[in-house]
C-alpha cells in the first residue's frame, strides 16, 4: 500500500508543474539549441527574447511569410505566456501557430537566424516537449548535422514508440545513420505514417523545401521497397495478400501527393514510389490504370519528363497493351510527345507505352474529328522508336482497327487517305516491309477487305483467304456500309456540278460527290448508282465537262489508291465505248502525272486509259475533231490554254507515248525520261519511240506548260512541273518563258493563301516554291537577273520561303552561268548587298555571294573598289589645312560623314570577307589587288586614326594563302614585283592587334622564301617588333607564327649576310638583341623552346656564345635567365659547349680591352649608352660560373672520356686547358679590380667543379707549386668549398684525399703566410670530417700539428679559431684515437678560453670555438675531462655568463652536454665545490648552474640521484640559503629580490625533480632536516635571517603541495604548529613579512585543495588552523590590505571549508567567521572583531565565495546568518551594504526563493 502510494506520488511529482518550484521551472526553460545548459540557466526571458527576436527579424527579410508570426508567438506579450497556465483550447490554438511556424522554418534550419528563432519556441513554449513529433520531423531531414544532435540532447526521455529509433542515439549523443531511419520507416508503421503526414501537411501549406522532400522521397521509396521485399512468401496467395496491404497503405499518400501538382519534388517522389510498386509487386491492370491516370493527370512542365518515365514503367507492367484514355490524351497534349518519348527510350523501357499510344491513335477511327492522332501514329513509325517485335504488334493493332472501322461508322476520306499512306509506308520501307508482310501472314487479316476499306493497293503481300468468321464480319460490315451509302447518295442527288470539276480548287459540290464516290468504291452496283447521278451528266460526257473532269480530278488528287484506280477505271470504261469524234487531249497532262505516280496499280490503269485514247485517235477520221472541254476545263482560264491540232496529238501519242506503255507501269520515272527525250528531239533507247519534229515538240511543250500554268489544282500542277522542269527548252522556246506566268502568279500569292491552297490538296508549300523557281533554266543567259527580278525591288508581301527558294535556285544555277555573266550578276548582287535597309533581299544577296564559288575576275573587280572607295571618301573630308591642324590629325567628320564611313567600312569588310572565303590561294592574280588594298588601308587608317585590324587581318590572310601556295612551286604564281614588304612590316609595327601581327609575320616569313631580296632589307624591324609584342603571346597560334618566322626568315638572313661576306654575328646583332630584350615578356614555359629554335637556326657553334652573353649582360643573374642559359647549353656536345665558353671568355676579355671589338656590337661596350665594361665583365663571369656549376658539362665530359676516342678526348682537354688559362689570365690582369677578380675566382671554382675529385687534386698540386700566394690561397679555398658540398666518396677519391693531408700539414708547419695556413687548416678540417673515419691513423698526425704551437699556438686570431674548430671536428671523427693530441689541445684551449674572456679583450668567435671543442669532447670522450678541467670550465663559464662581449648559446650547449654526458658524481662535486663562485658571479651564473643540476637529475637514472643524494642535498641547501645570505648582506647584496624569487622558483623545480626520483623513506629525513633548517637553523637573535629562511621554506612548500598534491597531504602534520606560529606574526601590511604571509596562504590553499585523505576534516587539525586562518581577515584594515586578503585568504578559507566537508565543521567555521561581520560588541560585551568596514567586507567576500562553492550545503547555516544579514543590510558602509545585497541575491538564486520574508 505504502509503496503503491509512493509510486503514485512520484509520478505526480514527475509530471507536476508546480509554479512555486522555481528551481524546476528554471531547469525546464534552460533547454536550448544554441546555449549550453550552464549559460542558458543564467538567462532570463528578456535576454532570450532579444537574441531570438533578432533571428526572427532576419528570417522575415528572407521570407515575408514569417511576418504574421510577429503578432503571435514573437510578440512582446509572448514573453509572459506560460503553457502551464493555459487551458486546453488555448494550448491547441498555440499548437496550430507553432506547427505552422515550424513547417515554414524547416527549409531555413541551416541558417543561424532560423535556429535562433526556433530556440525561442523551445525556451518559451517548450515545443520539444509539447509538440515533440512536429519538432522532430522538422529537424529530421538534417539528421546528419550537429543541429540535430543538439535537438536530441534536449528531447524528453520518454519518446513515444513512433520515435523509439532515436533513443539509442540520444543516449550516446551521436547522429543517427541513414540505414536505421529507413529500417524504422520499413518496420514501424507509426514512424512512416508520421513522416508522410508531416510532409503532406507542410506541402499543403506550401512550406515545402528540398531537404524535406528529398528525405521523404528517398525514405518512402526505400521503405516501400523494403516492405514489399519482406512480404515475399513461398505461397503466392499469401504474398499477394501482403502486397495488397502495402499498396493500400501507400495509395492514400500517393493520391494526396499527386493532387499537389505545383509541388514538383513531391510529385516526382510519388512517381518514384509508383515505379517501386510496379517493379516489386504484381499489380492488377485495373490498379495500374488508376495509377497511370493519376500520374498523367498530375504532371506539369517541370514534372512531365519524370511522369512520362513513370508512365512507361507502369505500362510495361500491364498485361494489356492499351492505356487509359486520360493517360493517352495527356500524352497527346504534350508538345512533341514523340521527341520526349525518344529521349527517355534510351534508358527506360517504353515498348508497352508506345503500343498503348498506337492503340489509342486508332481507337474510334470513325469518330475522330481531326488528324492529330493519325499524325502521331505516323511519327511513331517514322522515328523508328518501335523495335521489330513491337512494330509488328503495332501494325497488327492498326490493321485490326482499320478492318473493323466500317462497323463503327463511316471512315472519313482524310482518315482513309492518311491510313492508306501509312500502310503504303509499311510496304515501301526497307526496314518495315518484312515486318509488315510477316504481320499480315500471322494475323490472318483479309488483305482484300483491308484494301477495300482503305481504298489502296497493298503490294508485295500474299493474299490470304479470309476465315469464315471474317466473311461473316464482312457481311455485317457490308450491310452497315450499304445503309450508310444509301443515305449519302440520297443527300447528294440534288447536288449540281455546274461546270468542270477542274475549274476551281474549292468546289463544295465536288467534295460531297467525291465522299459519296469513295463509299461506292468496291461495289459495281453502287458505282452504277453513283455514275447515274444527274450532276455528273454521264450521257453528255463527250460534250459536257462534268463527268470526265470529276474522275480526272479524283485520280490526280490526294485520295486513296483504290479510289483513284476506280476513277481511272470509269474513264477507261467511258473511252472504250466512246465515239472517235471527240479529241481528249485535255486528259494527257493528267495521264502523264498518273504515269509518274508511285503506285504501280495507278500507273497500270493510267496506261490503259492512254492506250484507249490512242485507239480513239486511230479510229478518228476527222482531222480536227472537237477538243473536249476546250473552253470550260479550267473555267475562265481555259482560254489561255495552248491546244494541239488533232493530227498532231495523234502523232505525239502514237510516236512518243504509246511505245513505252509497259515501261511506265514498271518504272515510275520512265515517263519523265520519255517526256524529256521527246521534247529534246531525241528518243530513249529500246523504247520504240520515234523522234518528233520541232513544231510538234514546240506544240507539245507549250501545251503542257500552258496546262501547268492554268490548272487551278496544285497536286497535279506540282507533279506536272516536276516533269517539265527536266526540260530546259523545246522547239525554240524555254521553260523559263513558258512557265514564267506561273512563277509570277505564285510569287504574288499571299502567304496565307499559298498555305490554304496547298493544305487543301495535301502538298507542301516548300515543294511548290522549289518547283516554281526551277522553272528558270540556267541556260537562259538572264537566269540570275530573272530570278533576282522576282524579289527585287523587295516587297513586304513577298513570302520569306519564296525568297529563300529564289536565292537557293541562284546558288544552284550559278556554276553553270558563263563567267562574263557571273561578273555582271555578281555586280548586281553586290550593289543590293550594300543597301542600308536590312531586308531578306539584302541578306539573300549576301548569302549568295558568300555561298557560290566566285571567279578570280569577280573577286578582282570587287577588290578594285576598295582603293577607289577610299579615295572617294577622302575627297569628302575637310580642307587639308583644317585636317592638318585638327587634334590628333583626325579627319573631322559630320554625322553624315560618319554614316558614309560606316558604309565604306561595311563595304570593304564584305569584299575582303568574300575574298577570304573564296580560297584566295586558287586565285594568285589577286595578289596585286590585295597589295593595293593593303596600301589603301594603311593610308586610310592613318587618316581616320583607327586600327582597321579586322580588314588588315583579312587582307594579310588572303595574301598569306596565295604566298603559301606559291612556296610549294618552283616559280612564284604571281608577279613578285607587286610585293610591298614595307607595307607588311608597317602592319607589324603599327598595329595593336595580335591577329594582324601574326598574319603579317607569317606573310614576311613566306615572302622571304619566294622573294628574299625584296624582304630582307626590311626584316630587322620585324624582329624588333617581335621582341616587344608577339613573343609575349602565349596562344598556340602565336607560337606557330614565331616558329615559322624563325624557320623561314633567319636562314635567309644568314645566307644573305654570307653572300655579302659580312660577319654573321655582327650582322644579326639587332635580331639577337630583339629576342634577348623580349625574354622577360615571353611566357616562361616557351622560352627555352623559342631560344633553342633561334640558336639552332642561326648555328650553335657560331651564335650560342653571343646569345648567352647578351642574356647575361641584360639580365645579370636573373634566375629565370640562368635556367634558360643552362637549358640552351645542355643540348650541345661537350666540345661545342667548351668552345662556346672559350668564345664567351674571349668576349669578356674583349669587353675589358681598351679598344673593344665585337663586344661593342653585341654588348654595347664603348657606346654612349653602354654599361661600365667592368660591370659587364662581372655579370658575364658570374653567369659563366653558374653555367659551369649547373650545366651537364661534367657528366658529358665523363661520358666522352669513357666512350669516345682519343680525338674527342684530346679536343676536350685542349679546350679545358685553354679555358683555364683564359680564366687565370683575366684574374691576373684584373687582380686590382676586386669585383672582376672575385668573379673570375668564381669561374675558376666552378670550372674545377666540372672535374672529378682526383683530377681536381692533381690540378691543385700543380697550381700549389706556383709562387703566387694569392693563387695558392684561392685553390685551397676552392678545395674547401668542394669538400663542403657532397664530394665523391669512391675508394680512389678517399685514398687520394687522405694522401693529400701531408701536403696541407707541410703548409701549416712551413708557410709564413697565415692566410694560406688558415686555408690549409680549413681543408684539413673538411678532409677529417668527410674521410677521417676511413683511416683515422692518417689524421692523427694532422691533429697533433693543429694542436701544436704551429697552429693554435700562433698569435693570429683566425688561425687559432680555425684550429680549435678543426680539433672539434677531429674529436668527433677520431673519438678515442684523438687522445694523443689531447694534452696540448686541452691546456691550450682552456688558455685560449681564458684569453677570450679578458676584460676589454673579449673574443666571441674564439670563445664559441673552444666551447664547440669541449662539446665534442663531452660527447665523444667525456672521461678524458678531469675534475680540475671541470672546475676550470665552470669558473670560466661563470665569467662568460656575466660577460657582455660573448654569446651564451655555445656555453649553454657545452654545459648541457656536461650535465648529460660527464659522470654525474663528478659534475655534482664540481658544482658543489664552485657554488660560491657561481653566486659571486651573479644571478645569470647561478641560474645556469642550477640548470646543469636540473638537467643532470632529469637525464640520469634514479639510482644516480639516490647514490649522490648527499652532494645533491648539499647543493640544494646552499641554494635554499641564498635569500638569507642576500638579506644578511643588506646593502651589499648582489641579487635583487626579484632575482632571488626567480632563482628560488628554479630551486623548487629542481627539488621537485629530485623528489620524483626518491621514495618516501629517502625523502622524509630530508624534509625534516629542511624543516629544522628553516625553523631552528638560525640563531633567535637573527630575526631577519629566520624570516628569510621561513619565506624560502614556505615558498617551497607552496610548490611542494601544489605539485605533489594528495600524495604529500600528510606532510602537513609536520608544519601545522609552525604555520599557526607564522600566521600569528606574519602580516600582509608589513613589507618584511608580506612575502612569508603570501607564501603561507598559498601553501595552505594548495594543501586544503588537494586533501583526499580527510586530513583537514579531522577536528584536531581543523580546530588548530581554523581560528588563525579566519583571523587573517582582520588584517583587512584598508582598501589595499583588503584586496590582498580577499585575493589570498578568502580562497584558502574556501578550500578549507570544502575540505572540512561536514555540517559541524562548517558551523564551527561559520561561527568564527560571523563574528567578523558584526561591527559592535555582542551580548557578551566583547569586541566582535568586525569594527573595521574593510574587515566586514572581507568576511562578506568569504561568505560569498563559500556560498558559491558549497551552495545549499553552506546555506544550511542560513538561520544563524539571518540576524547578521539583517544588521549588515543597514550597515553604515556603502560597500558593505552593496556586497551584502549581492550575497542575498546569490542566496536567493541558490535556494530559488526570496529572503524578504525571512529578514523581516
Swiss-Prot record:
It is found in: Nucleus, Nucleolus; Membrane. Its main location: nucleus. It is a multi-pass membrane protein. Keywords: Membrane, Nucleus, Repeat, Ribonucleoprotein, Ribosome biogenesis, rRNA processing, Transmembrane, Transmembrane helix. The chain crosses the membrane at residues 944-964, 1000-1020. GO terms for biological process: maturation of SSU-rRNA from tricistronic rRNA transcript (SSU-rRNA, 5.8S rRNA, LSU-rRNA); positive regulation of transcription by RNA polymerase I. SUPFAM superfamilies: ARM repeat (SSF48371). HEAT repeats lie at residues 426-467, 581-619, 1043-1081, 1250-1288, 1294-1333, 1755-1793. It comes from the Eukaryota. One of its GO terms (cellular component) is 90S preribosome. One of its GO terms (molecular function) is snoRNA binding. SMART domains: BP28CT (SM01036). InterPro entries: ARM-like (IPR011989), ARM-type_fold (IPR016024), BP28_C_dom (IPR012954), HEAT_type_2 (IPR021133), HEAT_Utp10/HEAT1 (IPR056473), U3snoRNP10_N (IPR022125), UTP10 (IPR040191). Involved in nucleolar processing of pre-18S ribosomal RNA. Involved in ribosome biosynthesis. PANTHER family: BAP28, HEAT REPEAT-CONTAINING PROTEIN 1. Belongs to the HEATR1/UTP10 family. Component of the ribosomal small subunit (SSU) processome. This is U3 small nucleolar RNA-associated protein 10. It comes from Aspergillus niger (strain ATCC MYA-4892 / CBS 513.88 / FGSC A1513). The gene is utp10.
Amino acid at each position: 500500500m505504502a509503496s503503491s502510494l509512493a509510486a503514485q506520488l512520484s509520478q505526480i511529482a514527475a509530471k507536476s508543474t508546480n509554479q512555486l518550484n522555481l528551481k524546476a521551472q528554471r531547469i525546464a526553460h534552460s533547454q536550448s539549441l544554441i546555449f549550453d545548459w550552464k549559460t542558458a540557466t543564467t538567462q532570463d526571458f528578456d535576454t532570450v527574447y532579444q537574441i531570438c527576436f533578432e533571428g526572427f527579424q532576419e528570417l522575415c527579410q528572407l521570407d515575408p511569410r514569417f511576418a504574421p508570426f510577429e503578432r503571435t508567438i514573437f510578440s512582446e506579450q509572448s514573453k509572459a505566456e506560460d503553457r502551464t497556465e493555459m487551458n486546453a483550447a488555448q494550448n491547441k490554438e498555440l499548437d496550430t501557430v507553432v506547427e505552422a511556424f515550424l513547417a515554414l522554418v524547416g527549409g531555413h534550419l541551416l541558417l543561424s537566424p532560423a535556429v535562433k528563432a526556433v530556440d525561442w519556441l523551445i525556451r518559451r513554449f517548450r515545443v520539444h516537449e509539447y509538440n515533440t513529433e512536429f519538432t522532430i520531423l522538422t529537424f529530421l531531414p538534417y539528421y546528419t548535422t550537429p543541429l540535430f544532435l543538439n535537438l536530441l540532447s534536449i528531447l524528453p526521455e520518454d519518446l513515444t514508440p513512433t520515435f523509439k529509433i532515436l533513443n539509442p542515439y540520444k543516449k550516446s549523443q551521436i547522429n543517427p545513420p541513414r540505414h536505421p531511419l529507413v529500417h524504422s520507416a520499413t518496420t514501424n508503421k507509426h514512424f512512416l505514417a508520421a513522416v508522410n503526414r508531416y510532409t503532406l501537411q507542410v506541402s499543403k501549406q506550401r512550406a515545402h523545401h528540398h531537404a524535406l522532400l528529398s528525405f521523404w522521397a528517398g525514405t518512402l521509396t526505400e521503405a516501400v521497397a523494403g516492405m514489399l521485399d519482406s512480404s515475399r512468401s513461398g505461397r503466392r496467395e499469401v504474398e499477394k495478400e501482403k502486397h495488397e496491404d502495402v499498396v493500400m497503405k501507400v495509395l492514400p499518400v500517393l493520391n494526396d501527393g499527386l493532387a499537389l501538382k505545383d509541388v514538383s519534388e513531391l510529385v516526382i517522389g510519388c512517381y518514384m514510389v509508383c515505379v517501386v510498386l510496379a517493379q516489386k509487386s504484381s499489380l492488377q491492370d485495373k490498379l495500374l490504370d488508376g495509377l497511370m491516370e493519376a500520374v498523367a493527370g498530375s504532371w506539369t512542365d517541370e514534372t512531365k519528363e519524370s511522369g512520362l518515365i513513370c508512365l512507361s514503367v507502369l505500362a510495361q507492367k500491364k498485361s494489356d497493351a492499351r492505356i487509359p484514355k486520360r493517360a493517352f490524351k495527356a500524352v497527346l497534349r504534350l508538345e512533341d510527345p514523340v521527341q520526349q518519348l525518344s529521349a527517355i527510350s534510351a534508358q527506360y523501357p517504353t515498348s508497352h507505352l508506345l503500343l498503348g499510344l498506337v492503340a489509342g491513335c486508332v481507337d474510334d477511327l470513325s469518330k475522330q474529328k481531326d488528324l492529330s492522332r493519325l499524325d502521331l501514329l505516323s511519327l511513331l513509325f517514322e522515328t523508328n522508336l518501335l523495335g521489330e517485335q513491337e512494330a509488328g504488334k503495332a501494325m497488327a493493332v492498326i490493321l485490326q482497327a482499320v478492318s473493323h472501322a466500317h462497323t463503327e461508322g463511316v471512315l472519313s476520306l482524310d482518315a482513309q487517305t492518311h491510313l492508306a499512306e501509312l500502310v503504303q509506308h509499311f510496304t515501301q520501307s526497307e526496314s518495315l516491309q518484312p515486318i509488315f508482310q510477316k504481320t499480315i501472314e500471322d494475323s490472318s487479316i483479309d488483305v482484300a477487305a483491308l484494301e477495300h476499306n482503305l481504298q489502296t493497293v497493298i503490294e508485295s503481300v500474299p493474299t490470304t483467304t479470309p476465315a469464315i468468321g471474317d466473311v461473316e464480319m464482312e457481311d455485317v460490315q457490308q450491310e452497315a456500309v450499304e445503309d450508310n451509302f444509301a443515305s449519302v447518295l440520297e443527300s447528294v442527288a440534288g447536288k449540281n456540278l455546274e461546270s468542270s470539276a477542274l475549274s476551281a480548287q474549292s468546289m463544295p459540290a465536288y467534295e460531297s460527290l467525291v465522299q459519296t464516290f469513295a463509299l461506292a468504291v468496291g461495289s459495281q452496283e453502287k458505282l452504277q448508282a453513283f455514275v447515274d447521278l444527274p450532276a455528273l451528266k454521264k450521257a453528255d460526257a463527250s460534250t459536257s465537262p462534268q463527268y470526265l473532269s470529276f474522275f480526272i480530278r479524283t485520280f490526280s488528287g490526294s485520295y486513296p489508291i483504290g479510289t483513284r484506280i476506280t476513277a481511272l477505271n470509269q474513264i477507261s470504261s467511258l473511252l472504250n465505248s466512246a465515239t472517235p469524234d471527240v479529241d481528249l487531249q485535255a486528259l494527257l497532262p493528267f495521264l502523264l502525272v498518273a504515269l509518274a505516280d508511285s503506285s504501280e496499280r495507278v500507273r497500270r490503269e493510267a496506261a490503259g486509259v492512254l492506250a484507249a485514247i490512242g485507239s480513239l485517235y486511230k479510229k478518228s477520221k476527222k482531222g480536227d475533231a472537237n477538243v473536249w472541254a476546250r473552253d470550260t476545263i479550267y473555267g475562265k482560264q481555259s482560254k489561255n490554254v495552248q491546244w494541239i491540232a488533232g493530227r498532231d496529238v495523234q502523232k505525239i501519242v502514237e510516236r512518243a507515248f504509246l511505245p513505252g506503255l509497259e515501261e511506265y507501269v514498271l518504272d515510275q520515272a520512265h515517263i519523265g525520261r520519255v517526256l524529256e527525250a521527246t521534247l529534246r528531239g531525241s528518243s530513249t533507247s529500246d523504247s520504240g519511240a520515234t523522234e518528233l519534229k520541232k513544231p510538234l515538240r514546240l506544240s507539245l511543250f507549250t501545251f503542257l506548260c500552258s496546262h501547268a500554268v492554268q490548272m487551278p489544282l496544285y497536286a497535279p500542277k506540282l507533279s506536272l512541273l516536276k516533269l517539265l522542269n527536266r526540260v530546259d527548252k523545246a522547239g525554240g522556246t524555254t521553260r523559263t518563258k513558258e512557265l514564267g506566268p506561273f512563277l509570277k502568279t505564285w510569287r504574288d500569292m499571299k502567304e496565307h493563301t499559298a498555305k490554304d491552297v496547298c493544305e487543301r490538296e495535301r502538298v507542301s508549300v516548300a515543294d511548290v516554291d522549289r518547283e516554281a523557281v526551277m522553272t528558270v533554266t540556267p541556260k537562259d543567259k538572264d537566269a540570275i537577273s530573272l530570278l533576282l527580278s522576282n524579289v527585287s525591288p523587295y516587297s513586304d508581301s513577298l513570302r520569306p520561303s519564296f525568297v529563300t527558294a529564289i536565292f537557293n535556285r541562284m546558288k544552284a544555277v550559278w556554276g553553270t552561268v558563263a563567267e562574263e555573266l557571273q561578273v555582271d550578276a555578281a555586280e548586281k548582287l553586290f550593289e543590293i548587298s550594300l543597301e542600308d535597309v536590312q531586308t531578306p533581299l539584302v541578306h539573300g544577296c549576301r548569302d549568295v555571294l558568300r555561298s557560290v564559288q566566285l571567279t578570280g575576275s569577280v573577286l578582282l573587280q570587287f577588290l578594285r573598289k576598295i582603293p577607289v572607295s577610299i579615295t572617294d571618301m577622302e575627297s569628302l573630308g575637310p580642307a587639308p589645312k583644317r585636317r592638318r591642324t585638327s587634334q590628333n590629325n583626325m579627319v573631322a567628320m559630320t554625322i553624315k560623314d560618319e554614316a558614309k564611313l560606316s558604309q565604306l567600312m561595311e563595304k570593304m569588310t564584305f569584299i575582303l570577307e568574300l575574298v577570304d572565303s573564296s580560297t584566295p590561294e586558287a586565285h594568285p592574280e589577286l595578289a596585286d589587288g590585295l597589295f593595293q588594298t593593303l596600301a589603301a588601308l594603311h593610308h586610310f587608317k592613318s587618316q581616320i586614326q583607327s586600327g582597321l585590324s579586322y580588314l588588315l587581318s583579312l587582307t594579310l590572310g588572303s595574301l598569306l594563302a596565295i604566298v603559301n601556295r606559291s612556296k610549294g612551286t618552283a616559280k612564284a604564281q604571281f608577279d613578285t614585283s607587286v610585293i610591298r614588304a614595307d607595307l607588311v612590316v608597317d602592319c607589324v609595327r603599327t598595329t595593336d592587334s595580335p591577329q594582324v601581327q601574326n598574319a603579317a609575320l607569317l606573310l614576311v616569313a613566306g615572302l622571304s622564301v619566294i622573294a628574299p631580296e625584296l624582304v630582307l632589307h626590311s626584316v630587322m624591324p620585324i624582329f624588333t617588333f617581335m621582341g616587344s609584342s608577339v613573343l609575349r603571346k602565349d596562344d598556340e597560334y602565336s607560337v606557330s607564327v614565331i616558329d615559322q618566322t624563325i624557320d623561314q626568315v633567319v636562314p635567309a638572313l644568314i645566307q644573305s649576310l654570307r653572300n655579302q661576306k659580312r660577319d654573321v654575328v655582327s650582322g644579326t646583332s639587332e635580331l639577337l638583341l630583339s629576342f634577348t630584350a623580349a625574354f622577360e615578356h615571353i611566357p616562361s614555359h616557351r622560352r627555352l623552346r623559342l631560344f633553342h629554335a633561334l640558336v639552332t637556326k642561326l648555328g650553335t657553334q657560331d651564335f650560342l656564345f653571343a646569345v648567352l652573353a647578351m642574356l647575361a649582360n641584360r639580365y645579370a643573374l636573373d634566375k629565370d635567365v640562368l635556367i634558360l642559359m643552362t637549358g640552351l647549353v645542355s643540348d650541345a656536345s661537350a666540345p661545342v659547349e667548351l668552345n662556346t665558353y672559350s668564345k664567351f671568355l674571349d668576349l669578356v676579355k674583349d669587353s675589358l680591352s681598351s679598344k673593344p671589338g665585337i663586344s661593342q656590337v653585341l654588348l654595347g661596350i664603348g657606346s654612349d649608352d653602354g654599361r661600365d665594361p667592368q660591370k659587364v665583365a662581372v655579370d658575364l663571369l658570374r653567369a659563366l660560373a653558374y653555367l659551369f656549376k649547373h650545366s651537364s658539362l661534367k657528366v658529358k665530359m665523363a661520358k666522352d672520356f669513357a666512350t669516345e676516342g682519343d680525338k674527342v678526348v684530346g679536343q676536350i682537354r685542349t679546350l679545358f686547358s685553354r679555358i683555364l688559362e683564359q680564366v687565370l689570365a683575366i684574374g691576373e690582369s684584373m687582380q686590382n679590380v676586386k669585383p672582376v677578380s672575385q668573379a673570375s675566382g668564381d669561374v675558376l671554382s666552378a670550372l674545377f667543379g666540372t672535374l672529378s675529385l682526383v683530377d681536381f687534386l692533381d690540378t691543385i698540386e700543380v697550381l700549389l707549386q706556383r709562387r703566387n700566394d694569392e693563387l695558392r690561397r684561392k685553390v685551397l679555398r676552392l678545395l674547401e668549398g668542394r669538400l663542403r658540398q657532397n664530394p665523391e666518396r669512391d675508394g680512389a677519391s678517399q685514398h687520394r684525399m687522405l694522401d693529400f693531408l701531408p701536403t696541407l700539414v707541410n703548409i701549416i708547419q712551413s708557410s709564413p703566410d697565415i692566410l694560406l695556413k688558415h686555408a690549409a687548416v680549413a681543408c684539413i678540417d673538411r678532409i677529417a670530417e668527410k674521410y677521417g673515419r676511413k683511416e683515422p691513423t692518417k689524421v692523427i698526425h694532422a691533429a697533433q700539428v693543429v694542436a701544436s704551437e704551429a697552429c693554435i699556438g700562433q698569435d693570429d686570431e683566425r688561425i687559432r679559431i680555425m684550429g680549435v674548430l678543426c680539433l672539434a671536428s677531429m674529436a668527433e671523427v677520431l673519438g678515442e684515437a684523438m687522445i694523443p693530441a689531447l694534452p696540448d689541445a686541452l691546456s691550450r684551449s682552456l688558455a685560449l678560453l681564458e684569453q677570450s674572456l679578458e676584460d676589454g679583450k673579449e673574443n666571441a668567435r674564439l670563445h664559441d670555438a673552444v666551447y664547440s671543442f669541449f662539446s665534442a669532447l663531452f660527447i665523444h670522450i667525456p672521461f678524458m675531462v678531469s675534475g680540475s678541467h671541470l672546475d676550470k670550465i665552470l669558473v670560466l663559464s661563470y665569467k662568460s655568463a656575466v660577460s657582455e662581449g660573448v654569446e651564451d648559446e655555445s656555453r649553454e650547449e657545452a654545459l648541457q652536454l656536461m650535465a648529460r654526458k660527464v659522470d654525474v658524481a663528478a659534475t655534482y662535486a664540481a658544482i658543489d665545490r664552485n657554488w660560491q663562485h657561481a653566486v659571486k658571479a651573479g644571478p645569470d651564473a647561478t641560474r645556469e648552474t642550477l640548470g646543469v643540476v636540473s638537467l643532470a637529475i632529469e637525464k640520469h637514472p634514479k639510482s644516480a640521484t639516490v647514490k649522490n643524494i648527499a652532494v645533491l642535498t648539499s647543493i640544494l641547501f646552499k641554494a635554499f640559503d641564498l635569500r638569507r645570505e642576500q638579506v644578511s648582506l643588506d646593502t651589499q647584496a648582489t641579487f635583487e629580490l626579484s632575482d632571488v624569487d626567480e632563482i628560488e622558483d628554479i630551486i623548487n623545480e629542481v627539488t621537485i625533480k629530485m623528489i620524483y626520483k626518491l621514495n618516501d623513506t629517502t625523502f622524509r629525513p630530508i624534509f625534516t632536516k629542511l624543516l629544522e633548517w628553516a625553523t631552528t637553523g638560525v640563531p633567535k637573535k637573527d630575526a631577519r635571517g629566520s624570516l628569510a629562511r621561513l619565506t624560502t621554506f614556505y615558498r617551497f612548500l607552496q610548490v611542494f603541495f601544489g605539485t605533489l598534491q594528495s600524495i604529500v597531504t600528510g606532510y602537513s602534520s609536520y608544519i601545522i604548529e609552525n604555520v599557526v606560529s607564522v600566521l600569528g606574526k606574519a602580516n600582509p601590511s608589513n613589507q618584511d613579512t608580506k612575502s612569508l604571509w603570501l607564501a603561507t596562504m598559498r601553501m595552505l590553499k594548495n594543501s586544503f585543495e588537494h586533501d583526499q585523505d580527510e586530513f583537514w576534516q579531522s577536528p584536531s587539525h581543523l580546530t588548530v588552523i581554523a581560528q588563525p586562518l579566519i583571523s587573517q581577515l582582520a588584517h583587512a584594515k584598508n582598501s589595499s590590505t583588503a584586496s590582498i586578503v580577499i585575493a589570498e585568504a578568502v580562497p584558502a578559507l574556501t578550500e578549507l571549508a570544502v575540505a572540512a566537508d561536514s555540517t559541524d565543521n562548517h558551523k564551527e567555521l561559520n561561527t568564527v567567521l560571523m563574528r567578523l561581520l558584526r561591527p559592535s560588541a555582542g551580548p557578551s560585551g566583547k569586541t566582535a572583531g568586525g569594527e573595521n568596514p574593510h574587515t566586514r567586507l572581507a568576511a562578506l567576500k568569504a561568505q560569498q565565495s563559500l556560498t558559491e562553492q558549497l551552495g545549499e550545503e553552506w546555506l544550511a547555516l542560513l538561520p544563524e546568518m539571518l540576524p547578521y544579514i539583517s544588521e549588515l543590510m543597514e550597515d553604515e558602509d556603502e560597500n558593505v551594504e552593496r556586497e551584502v545585497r549581492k550575497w542575498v541575491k546569490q542566496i536567493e538564486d541558490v535556494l530559488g526563493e526570496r529572503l524578504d520574508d525571512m529578514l523581516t
